[in-house]
Design a protein with these regions (language model features):
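Conserved beta-alpha-beta core of the PfkB/ribokinase-like small-molecule kinase fold
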Residues: 16-85
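Phosphate-coordinating loops and pocket residues in cytosolic domains that bind phosphorylated ligands
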Residues: 5, 60, 78, 159, ...
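A short small-residue
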Residues: 13-16, 143-145
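Single conserved hydrophobic/aromatic residue that forms the stacking wall/gate
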Residues: 1-5, 9-12
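Conserved functional loop/turn residues at catalytic and ligand-binding sites
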Residues: 2, 62, 98
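Conserved phosphate-binding/catalytic region of the ribokinase-like
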Residues: 37-38, 56, 84-192
């Protein structure tokens, strides 16, 4: 960790660090927590997209965003989560433990965002033909981060996240910017 911490190019409060996925067995299971502890107090927005202990161990360090899916959220609390109201209930429990914002993906059932300022957003999944769900969750995180940096608005970040994740699921590979923008245009047209 000493090497990782000394090599990070994080400079200021506008930086975002995304900690995502599993870690090799040879690494300590506290790796994400150790990184967050090392960066504590620098005002960096840290996003964590991981499962089980990798996710729950970081909550004390108040990550800017965590992104479990509904099944992972249920595993954390030992329950089965089947609807968006349950997602909101348990997302708030993660906030009580330290998460600032909780974005929960629900595959074809959409997504939910519970924000640090008390807003709750629910979305159905955009319509499209599923081609490849690999990377859709990572794409959702990338879209959310991009949308938040661009707008400093949770609703816009949520829309970008949902549309980016969905566009990737509707693509053979990861979505392109035009594919994401086309879904956002559809979303905005449908809501007007």
């Amino acid at each position: 960790l000493r090497l990782v911490g000394s090599e990070m190019c994080i400079r200021d409060r506008s930086d975002v660090l995304v900690l995502a996925g599993s870690i090799p067995d040879v690494m300590p299971s506290s790796m994400y927590m150790d990184i967050m502890k090392h960066l504590e107090g620098r005002g960096i927005n840290i996003v964590v997209d991981a499962t089980r202990n990798l996710l729950t161990n970081v909550l004390a360090y108040k990550p800017f965003l965590i992104k479990p899916n509904n099944h992972e959220l249920g595993e954390i609390f030992g329950v089965e989560i089947t609807d968006k109201d349950d997602v909101i209930k348990y997302a708030k429990k993660l906030q009580e433990q330290g998460a600032r914002n909780v974005l929960v993906s629900m595959a074809g059932d959409g997504a939910v965002l519970v924000t640090e300022d008390g807003q709750e957003f629910k979305a159905n999944a955009p319509k499209g033909k599923l081609k490849n769900s690999v990377g859709a969750g990572d794409s959702m995180v990338a879209g959310f981060v991009y949308g938040y940096i661009k707008s400093n608005d949770y609703k816009q970040a949520f829309i970008y996240g949902v549309c980016t994740g969905s566009a990737s699921a509707f693509s053979e590979e990861l979505a392109t910017k035009p594919e994401v923008e086309a879904l956002i245009d559809k979303w905005e047209s449908a809501s007007n």
